Amino acid sequence: MNNNKRAIVGALCVLALLALASPGPATAADEDANLKVPRFVSLHSDKVNLRTGPGRQYPIEWVLTKKDMPVEIVAQFEHWRRIQTSDGTKGWVQEHMVAGKRTVIVNSGDVHPVYQLPDPASPVVARAAPGVVARLLECRGTLCRVEADNISGWMQRTDIWGVLPDETVP
Protein backbone atom coordinates (compact mmCIF):
# COMPACT_ATOMS: atom_id res chain seq x y z
CA MET A 1 0.00 0.00 0.00
CA ASN A 2 1.44 3.38 -0.88
CA ASN A 3 1.82 6.23 1.59
CA ASN A 4 -1.24 8.17 0.33
CA LYS A 5 -3.54 5.19 0.84
CA ARG A 6 -2.08 4.55 4.31
CA ALA A 7 -2.63 8.20 5.25
CA ILE A 8 -6.25 8.08 4.06
CA VAL A 9 -6.97 4.81 5.88
CA GLY A 10 -5.31 6.18 9.02
CA ALA A 11 -7.32 9.40 8.85
CA LEU A 12 -10.56 7.45 8.39
CA CYS A 13 -9.73 5.28 11.41
CA VAL A 14 -9.09 8.37 13.55
CA LEU A 15 -12.38 9.94 12.40
CA ALA A 16 -14.27 6.74 13.17
CA LEU A 17 -12.78 6.59 16.68
CA LEU A 18 -13.63 10.25 17.30
CA ALA A 19 -17.20 9.69 16.15
CA LEU A 20 -17.57 6.76 18.55
CA ALA A 21 -16.05 8.68 21.46
CA SER A 22 -18.06 11.88 21.04
CA PRO A 23 -21.31 12.29 22.93
CA GLY A 24 -24.41 11.82 20.81
CA PRO A 25 -27.28 14.24 20.52
CA ALA A 26 -29.26 15.00 23.64
CA THR A 27 -32.09 12.53 24.17
CA ALA A 28 -35.51 13.10 25.68
CA ALA A 29 -34.21 11.30 28.78
CA ASP A 30 -31.36 13.80 29.09
CA GLU A 31 -33.79 16.70 28.78
CA ASP A 32 -36.14 15.09 31.33
CA ALA A 33 -33.29 14.75 33.81
CA ASN A 34 -32.81 18.53 33.67
CA LEU A 35 -36.41 19.33 34.62
CA LYS A 36 -37.07 20.59 38.12
CA VAL A 37 -38.06 18.36 41.01
CA PRO A 38 -40.70 18.12 42.35
CA ARG A 39 -42.94 18.07 39.29
CA PHE A 40 -46.10 16.26 38.24
CA VAL A 41 -46.42 13.72 35.42
CA SER A 42 -48.81 10.84 34.73
CA LEU A 43 -48.49 7.07 34.44
CA HIS A 44 -47.76 5.95 30.89
CA SER A 45 -49.20 2.45 31.30
CA ASP A 46 -51.92 0.57 33.15
CA LYS A 47 -49.25 -1.59 34.81
CA VAL A 48 -46.35 0.21 36.46
CA ASN A 49 -44.03 -1.55 38.90
CA LEU A 50 -43.17 0.57 41.92
CA ARG A 51 -39.79 -0.56 43.29
CA THR A 52 -38.02 0.03 46.59
CA GLY A 53 -34.95 1.46 44.84
CA PRO A 54 -33.71 2.82 41.51
CA GLY A 55 -32.93 -0.39 39.65
CA ARG A 56 -34.39 -3.69 38.47
CA GLN A 57 -32.52 -5.47 41.25
CA TYR A 58 -34.79 -3.84 43.83
CA PRO A 59 -38.03 -5.65 44.71
CA ILE A 60 -41.42 -4.55 43.44
CA GLU A 61 -43.39 -3.17 46.36
CA TRP A 62 -46.55 -2.05 44.53
CA VAL A 63 -48.08 -2.34 41.07
CA LEU A 64 -49.94 0.76 39.94
CA THR A 65 -52.77 -0.06 37.54
CA LYS A 66 -54.37 3.22 36.47
CA LYS A 67 -52.97 4.69 33.24
CA ASP A 68 -52.90 8.51 33.23
CA MET A 69 -53.00 8.67 37.04
CA PRO A 70 -51.08 11.76 38.20
CA VAL A 71 -47.91 11.17 40.19
CA GLU A 72 -45.34 13.55 41.60
CA ILE A 73 -41.66 13.06 40.79
CA VAL A 74 -39.84 13.73 44.07
CA ALA A 75 -36.35 12.50 43.08
CA GLN A 76 -34.48 11.13 40.08
CA PHE A 77 -31.43 8.96 39.58
CA GLU A 78 -30.16 8.21 36.08
CA HIS A 79 -33.12 6.62 34.23
CA TRP A 80 -35.22 6.15 37.36
CA ARG A 81 -37.82 8.44 38.92
CA ARG A 82 -38.97 8.32 42.53
CA ILE A 83 -42.67 9.08 42.49
CA GLN A 84 -45.38 9.71 45.01
CA THR A 85 -49.08 9.00 44.48
CA SER A 86 -51.95 11.10 45.81
CA ASP A 87 -52.25 8.80 48.83
CA GLY A 88 -48.56 9.23 49.73
CA THR A 89 -47.26 5.91 48.38
CA LYS A 90 -43.66 6.32 47.19
CA GLY A 91 -41.39 4.20 45.04
CA TRP A 92 -39.07 4.09 42.04
CA VAL A 93 -40.14 3.59 38.40
CA GLN A 94 -38.25 3.54 35.13
CA GLU A 95 -38.45 6.93 33.41
CA HIS A 96 -40.33 5.55 30.39
CA MET A 97 -43.22 4.51 32.65
CA VAL A 98 -44.22 8.13 33.22
CA ALA A 99 -45.38 10.66 30.64
CA GLY A 100 -45.44 14.44 30.46
CA LYS A 101 -49.22 14.41 30.00
CA ARG A 102 -50.68 16.43 32.85
CA THR A 103 -53.59 14.99 34.76
CA VAL A 104 -55.15 15.56 38.17
CA ILE A 105 -57.18 13.43 40.54
CA VAL A 106 -60.17 14.79 42.42
CA ASN A 107 -59.54 14.86 46.18
CA SER A 108 -61.47 12.73 48.63
CA GLY A 109 -64.51 13.98 50.49
CA ASP A 110 -67.69 15.17 48.86
CA VAL A 111 -68.23 15.77 45.16
CA HIS A 112 -66.60 18.99 44.01
CA PRO A 113 -68.12 21.64 41.70
CA VAL A 114 -66.82 22.19 38.17
CA TYR A 115 -67.43 25.78 37.09
CA GLN A 116 -68.16 27.06 33.59
CA LEU A 117 -65.70 29.96 33.92
CA PRO A 118 -62.58 30.62 36.02
CA ASP A 119 -64.82 32.18 38.65
CA PRO A 120 -66.51 30.33 41.54
CA ALA A 121 -69.55 32.59 41.03
CA SER A 122 -70.07 31.19 37.50
CA PRO A 123 -72.57 28.38 36.80
CA VAL A 124 -71.67 24.85 37.87
CA VAL A 125 -71.48 22.62 34.77
CA ALA A 126 -70.73 19.36 36.58
CA ARG A 127 -69.77 17.81 39.89
CA ALA A 128 -66.62 15.70 40.12
CA ALA A 129 -66.54 12.67 42.39
CA PRO A 130 -63.47 11.83 44.47
CA GLY A 131 -60.96 9.70 42.58
CA VAL A 132 -61.92 10.94 39.11
CA VAL A 133 -58.84 11.48 36.92
CA ALA A 134 -59.07 14.47 34.59
CA ARG A 135 -56.73 16.08 32.09
CA LEU A 136 -55.18 19.32 33.35
CA LEU A 137 -55.48 22.09 30.75
CA GLU A 138 -54.48 25.28 32.56
CA CYS A 139 -54.45 27.06 35.91
CA ARG A 140 -55.25 30.67 36.75
CA GLY A 141 -54.79 31.69 40.35
CA THR A 142 -56.80 29.35 42.57
CA LEU A 143 -58.68 27.66 39.71
CA CYS A 144 -57.60 25.05 37.15
CA ARG A 145 -59.35 24.05 33.94
CA VAL A 146 -59.79 20.30 33.63
CA GLU A 147 -61.45 17.92 31.20
CA ALA A 148 -62.94 14.47 31.75
CA ASP A 149 -65.50 12.53 29.72
CA ASN A 150 -65.84 15.43 27.24
CA ILE A 151 -66.77 17.84 30.04
CA SER A 152 -64.49 20.81 30.52
CA GLY A 153 -64.61 23.31 33.34
CA TRP A 154 -62.79 24.98 36.20
CA MET A 155 -62.10 23.49 39.62
CA GLN A 156 -60.62 24.90 42.78
CA ARG A 157 -56.93 24.03 42.96
CA THR A 158 -57.55 22.76 46.51
CA ASP A 159 -60.12 20.22 45.20
CA ILE A 160 -57.59 18.42 42.98
CA TRP A 161 -54.20 16.75 43.39
CA GLY A 162 -51.61 16.94 40.63
CA VAL A 163 -50.57 20.58 40.47
CA LEU A 164 -48.20 22.52 42.71
CA PRO A 165 -49.75 25.35 44.76
CA ASP A 166 -47.82 28.11 42.98
CA GLU A 167 -47.39 26.39 39.60
CA THR A 168 -48.32 28.16 36.39
CA VAL A 169 -49.91 25.82 33.87
CA PRO A 170 -50.30 27.31 30.38
For the regions a protein language model found, what residue spans apply to each?
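Bacterial N-terminal signal peptides
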Residues: 10-21
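N-terminal secretory signal peptides that target proteins for export/translocation
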Residues: 1-5
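SH3-family beta-barrel domains
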Residues: 26-52, 63-67, 74-89, 93-118, ...
